[in-house]
Structures are given as structure tokens and as C-alpha cells.
């Protein structure tokens, strides 16, 4: 069973990686996500793609999900969202707004269709393992959505209209005086959704409306900088769709209503002491979701309501020291408290962690090196250290870059506490923390026909760990243009997957979760900037 799963994953991982990206941007653009401090995109040895303000405006898209899809990233056209970066699903990609993790993962996927692009300054996509700096969920990379910071006093009214009766209206204003600046934006949007298969019941993407409200206030005297930002995202959708059950793949015609809300608060204080910069960051990211589904099941009308809330609270201190123009050291530490409340997981669940990281950036002209590591300690899964080193060497118009780094992802609440289906429903899915007691109960009542796994293999999960390798070469045509190719591979240990555990005497199938054998994801990608 484990070997079959491994072969399937290898097949998937090599079939979706080849992509070509094009963008109109300056090679001298500054990036921050790969190092937690500003460096030139051209100098960065870590593969990073920047989608700038001008390109976002030229593409004339509505949501963050649309933007990723336009840039060649595979996106699932479903309410649950989800995407793939270098063949790894969104479970392995950390997504942030201004460096703050976005809460709202459902079944590992993160829906970005509720984030409008009107307030987005640029998007930085860092590819490859970044657990050495960002920790959990960053095995496949990091997507950092950077919002607009304000500017000259102005007032704007913007409208957009597109296919599927997609409309958008936005109102924004910048104002400030001397050391104080404020930028506010309100955006309203509507869409009729779309149906990729008219021969089936319902729509692929349901009709929806969205509301985005953002505000950032900043005070700076050149030495001290205070900033407070708030981003609120709401999405409502309603319509007819289909739900696939685990009983012989039966499709159920369903009327669905879904409401989701994100609120991200970020309070920052930064002080410059000559070559030393210290920053205190206090953030809170919350998410709530309500899903109501009405359908007919075996001749009976059924109404199902699923509600959930999530919250990520994270205080952090970031310190950087510029030894000279060629050397910069970054040291940071903090803690994270993650809470998830839903009946599917048996009520409120909590996962706490603390972390610290150290990184050094060395620029020797033709040779640039970034080396560092991060230590994470979890209340339930122990500790993990994730080192990484990256280098870039320039020879004439050619540049060679390479990286090797480790990553990790701890089990999520779904794989530990999920309860789905039941003994009398044809299928039963249980998280690792619950399955042993249920098996013991049904075995004592002689209700289990057979098991395919030993209980000790499915009653506890370990964190996934990985080692990623990256090698690339690029050719600089001129100041604005270059072409390149990157070869990469990620070797993952203790991959967490759902597995067939056994069967009850009434033919109900039992599923659980376990750490399967090692898996490898590898591929090649081409890049073109002009």
C-alpha cells in the first residue's frame, strides 16, 4: 500500500512542474520575504518571483486566486481553494499578508478568492523550502502579499467589469501630514460564477459577493516608526452544486450557502540605532466560516450546518545588524498560538509553539551567500531545527544559484481530530488521536471484519520533514531582461496521508491517517523576464 502511494505521488509530482513565467519588472527590484530584510532581487540567491504593481494593473484581474492562476500556478476552481507550487499543494506553502500568516486553511487548502487585488502593492513568491526562516507550512515556499503603504494625499474611485458578470467598485483615500500617513480602501465585488460542465448539475464556481476593507496608519520620525494595519475580507456565495460522498462515489445535488470572514491585525514598532534595527511585531489573524448545505439523501431532506473559527496570535521580535555594505545578520524570536474551533474536530483545539531564527547575508560582489536556520518547539510534537544555505555566483552575463535546506510540517487538526461519516453511513474517517478508542470499542463488540493497519501505526502522527535541493542558471540579456532554468527536488520523510484502515461487518469502510514512506517531488521550470 505504501509503495503504491509513493509511486502515485512521484507520478503527480513530475507531471505538473514545467511552467514558464513572464513579467515586466526591473531586475533591480527589492525583495524582503527571502531574508526578512531588503535586498536586491538580482542579488538574491533564493529563487524568487515578484509580481509588481504595474503588472497587477496590466493583468486587470479581480482576486489573488486569479493572479496566481494567471502566473501559471495550478489553482483549484472550488470554494475550498487550493493551489500547487512546484507540485506541492497549498498545505506546504505559507501564505501571508505583510508577513502575517493568513488563517483559514480548510482540509489543508487556503482559499484566496476573497482577497481583492485593489490594495495589493506586489506579491513575492519565494520557491523552495523556507522553513529556515518561516517555519511550519513552508516546505514548498512562501507567498507574501504586500499591501499598499500610502503616498501623496489623494482620493480615488475605481470600477472594473469582466466575464461572468464580474463587477468591482473600490473607494480609496490617502492622507497625511508631516510624519503621519494613512491609507484606507473599501472594495465591493460581485460575480455570477461559472460552470465548466453544463451537462452536470449546478456550477463549478458559485455566484458570490465580496467585501474588502483595509486601513494602515503610520507615524515615522526617521528613527522610530509605528504602524497599525487592519485587513478585513468577506465572501458570501450561494448556489447549486454537487457533493461527492464516499459511498460508491455518489453525487448529491446540493444547494449551498457559504460565508467566510478574515480579519488580520498587525501592530509594528521599529527603531533604528545606526547600523542596528530592532522591530517588535504583534499580529493576530482570525477566520470564521459558515457553510449550510441542503440536499436529498436516500429520499430524505437533509440540512447540514458546518461552522468553524480559527485564530493565529503571534508576537515576534526581529533584530538586524548591518556590519557593513556586504554583511547583514538577522536574529528573530517569538511564539505562536493557533486555535481551531469546530464540531468536526470535537470542539476547540489549540497548538502552541515558540521559535527563534538566525540568518546571515554575505555579498562579495560576484558571490552572494545566505545561510541560517530556525528552531521551532511545539507543545505536542517536540522541537525541530531547519537549516538552509543558498549561494549565487555571477560570471559575466551568466548567474549560477544553488540552495539546500530542510523543512517541516506538523500534523494539522484535521489529521488528528477529524470525525466524518459514521458506522451506519457507509464510510468512517477518524483522526489519529481518536481512531484507537473507536477501533477498540467496535472490536469489543465484534463489529470489525478486518484491519489493514496495526493500531500503533495509525494512532500517532509525526511531523513531516524534508530536504530540498535547487540549482539554476540564468543569462542576463540586458538591464531589464533575462532567461533562466531551475532544477529542483524535495525529498519528504513521514509524509502524512489518509489510508484505508479496514472494514466493519456491515461493509462500512474505515479510513485514518498515517506517516507513509518517503516521497520525492522534482521538476524543472523555465523563466523569462523582459
Regions found by a protein language model. Name each.
Residues 48, 65-101, 121:
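Extracytoplasmic beta-strand/coil segments of soluble accessory domains associated
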Residues 26-56, 90-93:
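N-terminal periplasmic "start-of-domain" segments of outer-membrane beta-barrel proteins
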Residues 183, 214, 218-237, 255-381, ...:
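Face-selective signature of the C-terminal outer-membrane beta-barrel domain
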Residues 100-127, 215:
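Short acidic/polar hinge/loop motifs at secondary-structure boundaries
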Amino acid at each position: 500500500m505504501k509503495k503504491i502511494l509513493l509511486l502515485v505521488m512521484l507520478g503527480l509530482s513530475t507531471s505538473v512542474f514545467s511552467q514558464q513565467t513572464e513579467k515586466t519588472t526591473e531586475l533591480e527590484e527589492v525583495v524582503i520575504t527571502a531574508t526578512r530584510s531588503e535586498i536586491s532581487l538580482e542579488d538574491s540567491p533564493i529563487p524568487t518571483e515578484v509580481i509588481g504593481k504595474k503588472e497587477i494593473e496590466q493583468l486587470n484581474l479581480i482576486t489573488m486566486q486569479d493572479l496566481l492562476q494567471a502566473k501559471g500556478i495550478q489553482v483549484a476552481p472550488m470554494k475550498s481553494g487550493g493551489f500547487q507550487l512546484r507540485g506541492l499543494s497549498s498545505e506546504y506553502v505559507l501564505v501571508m499578508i505583510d508577513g502575517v500568516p493568513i488563517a483559514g486553511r480548510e482540509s489543508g487548502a487556503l482559499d484566496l478568492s476573497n482577497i481583492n487585488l485593489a490594495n495589493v502593492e506586489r506579491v513575492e513568491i519565494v520557491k523552495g523550502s523556507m522553513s529556515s526562516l518561516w517555519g511550519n507550512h513552508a516546505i514548498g515556499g512562501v507567498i507574501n502579499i504586500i499591501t499598499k503603504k500610502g503616498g501623496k494625499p489623494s482620493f480615488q474611485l475605481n470600477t472594473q467589469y469582466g466575464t461572468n458578470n464580474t463587477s468591482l467598485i473600490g473607494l480609496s483615500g490617502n492622507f497625511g501630514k508631516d510624519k503621519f500617513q494613512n491609507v484606507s480602501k473599501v472594495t465591493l465585488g460581485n460575480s455570477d460564477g461559472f460552470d465548466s460542465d453544463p451537462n452536470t448539475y449546478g456550477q463549478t464556481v458559485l455566484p458570490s459577493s465580496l467585501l474588502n476593507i483595509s486601513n494602515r496608519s503610520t507615524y515615522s520620525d526617521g528613527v522610530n516608526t509605528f504602524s497599525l494595519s487592519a485587513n478585513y475580507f468577506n465572501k458570501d456565495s450561494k448556489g447549486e452544486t454537487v457533493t461527492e460522498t464516499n459511498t460508491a462515489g455518489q453525487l448529491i445535488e446540493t444547494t449551498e450557502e457559504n460565508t467566510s470572514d478574515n480579519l488580520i491585525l498587525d501592530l509594528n514598532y521599529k527603531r533604528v540605532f545606526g547600523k542596528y534595527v530592532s522591530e517588535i511585531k504583534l499580529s493576530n489573524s482570525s477566520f470564521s466560516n459558515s457553510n449550510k448545505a441542503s440536499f436529498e439523501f436516500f429520499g430524505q431532506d437533509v440540512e447540514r450546518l458546518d461552522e468553524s473559527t480559527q485564530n493565529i496570535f503571534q508576537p515576534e521580535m526581529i533584530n538586524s545588524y548591518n556590519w557593513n555594505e556586504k554583511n547583514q545578520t538577522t536574529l528573530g524570536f517569538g511564539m505562536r498560538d493557533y486555535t481551531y474551533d469546530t464540531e468536526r474536530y470535537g470542539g476547540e483545539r489549540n497548538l502552541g509553539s515558540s521559535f527563534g531564527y538566525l540568518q546571515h547575508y554575505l555579498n562579495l560582489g560576484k558571490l552572494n551567500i545566505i545561510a541560517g536556520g530556525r528552531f521551532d518547539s511545539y507543545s505536542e510534537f517536540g522541537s525541530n531545527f531547519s537549516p538552509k544555505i543558498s549561494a549565487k555566483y555571477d560570471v559575466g552575463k551568466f548567474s549560477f544559484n544553488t540552495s539546500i535546506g530542510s523543512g517541516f510540517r506538523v500534523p494539522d487538526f484535521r489529521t488528528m481530530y477529524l470525525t466524518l461519516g459514521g458506522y451506519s453511513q457507509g464510510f468512517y474517517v477518524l483522526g489519529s488521536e481518536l481512531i484507537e478508542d473507536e477501533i477498540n470499542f467496535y472490536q469489543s463488540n465484534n463489529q470489525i471484519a478486518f484491519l489493514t493497519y496495526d493500531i500503533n501505526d495509525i494512532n500517532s502522527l509525526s511531523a513531516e520533514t524534508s530536504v530540498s535541493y535547487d540549482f539554476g542558471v540564468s543569462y542576463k540579456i540586458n538591464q531589464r531582461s533575462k532567461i533562466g532554468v531551475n532544477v529542483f527536488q524535495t525529498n519528504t520523510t513521514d509524509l502524512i496521508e489518509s489510508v484505508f484502515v479496514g472494514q466493519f461487518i456491515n461493509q462500512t469502510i474505515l479510513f485514518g491517517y498515517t506517516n507513509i514512506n518517503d516521497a520525492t517531488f522534482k521538476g524543472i521550470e523555465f523563466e523569462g523576464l523582459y
